[in-house]
């Protein structure tokens, strides 16, 4: 007998209002044939590769930290094209259109020779080498050693019109029921998203983690990251961004291998289960009590990685990149007349060793007690950009999407939506500044807020460095050649015939 039964699952109905669809910038931005070249000055920075050198009272930074393992987050400011005195004013109609910039090409120039820089810690938490052992050795109260290594090799850059989004693992809040039982326990972890700022450290082989909070012994990692948060670009989030402003495109090259294999010192927080769960011998068989192996050694193993060979054959820098199609809906449109270029590169990681004598006289013999050794790291950048002039029509559907994306863009264009009319009656005094009436309301003029003011960037001002003469610059000539904007001059052959020489006949 067949019985009809009601459906036990949920019935999903489509939403009654239409779902908003985000359009690509190619759908409403019209590109012109006007291109500009912009190039920065040589951008130089010098500092200590491991930490800030502070004054004796700790209030002033005398030498900043400049490491090859830091991000360089450039904020490039461009002029407002709507305020340009264009040579051809027929390019656009200011009553019906607004001008914006589009990134057509980019070259990140890097100076200085290739080199490998080492990092380390004078009190590194390394009990011993675990790859080649000749005897079984337990730990003592303090087994830290002076250890150094070369970091993972990283070359990377991310280009967008908003800052690059990073991710790292951090300590998570504890549940209320477990707050009083956390002494000596491993804290819960959560993945956090933060903006990558200039000077943030990238992963050098120990992971993207908040070492400030999660490295209590201050010895598990090297000096340059022991008091820092190591971040990694959140490519998944930026690729799925509905507007695609954070990452038009990126280039990435990472390489490393495990060079040394060590074990940590200290007690193991999560003991091997055999020793705590009724000795069920699933992981090891215990040794006799008179052997050294009876007391298990530490099982917290870790490698120190190496970036290996640094070569000019695998460089992402000092070469042009052309943007034809971005990965998101924003195809290179620079909203707000600004561009964010986030760079990570430690292939030019040489640290200078500078020795200075503490004696005033001439140094005639070596004495380590009268010599001081200093470390310095230098970096050199130059940014070159090809900009394309584009037009945005002031249509209702276009302005609606731009307003939903970023209402500040319409304010910069001196546009705005008319608010709903207020039918209430307001009081308007004639002599409001006289003593006979009440004090006028203090109206504070609202200044335009910078949404990225709280972040640290390397500001690069290109508002007065644009040029239409592309052939006068290296990147401009490359752009002209690859885009076919200028054809080669034809070689006109002469129509005059050259007579052949006559041979003399031998007599």
UniProtKB/Swiss-Prot annotation:
The keyword Secreted does not apply. It is found in: Virion; Host nucleus. GO terms for molecular function: structural molecule activity. InterPro entries: Capsid_L1_Papillomavir, Capsid_L1_sf_Papillomavir, dsDNA_vir_gr_I_capsid. Keywords: Capsid protein, Disulfide bond, Host nucleus, Host-virus interaction, Late protein, T=7 icosahedral capsid protein, Viral attachment to host cell, Viral penetration into host cytoplasm, Virion, Virus endocytosis by host, Virus entry into host cell. One of its GO terms (biological process) is virion attachment to host cell. One of its GO terms (cellular component) is T=7 icosahedral viral capsid. SUPFAM superfamilies: Group I dsDNA viruses. Self-assembles into homopentamers. The capsid has an icosahedral symmetry and consists of 72 capsomers, with each capsomer being a pentamer of L1. Interacts with the minor capsid protein L2; this interaction is necessary for viral genome encapsidation. Interacts with protein E2; this interaction enhances E2-dependent replication and transcription activation. Forms an icosahedral capsid with a T=7 symmetry and a 50 nm diameter. The capsid is composed of 72 pentamers linked to each other by disulfide bonds and associated with L2 proteins. Binds to heparan sulfate proteoglycans on cell surface of basal layer keratinocytes to provide initial virion attachment. This binding mediates a conformational change in the virus capsid that facilitates efficient infection. The virion enters the host cell via endocytosis. During virus trafficking, L1 protein dissociates from the viral DNA and the genomic DNA is released to the host nucleus. Belongs to the papillomaviridae L1 protein family. This is Major capsid protein L1. It comes from Human papillomavirus 37.
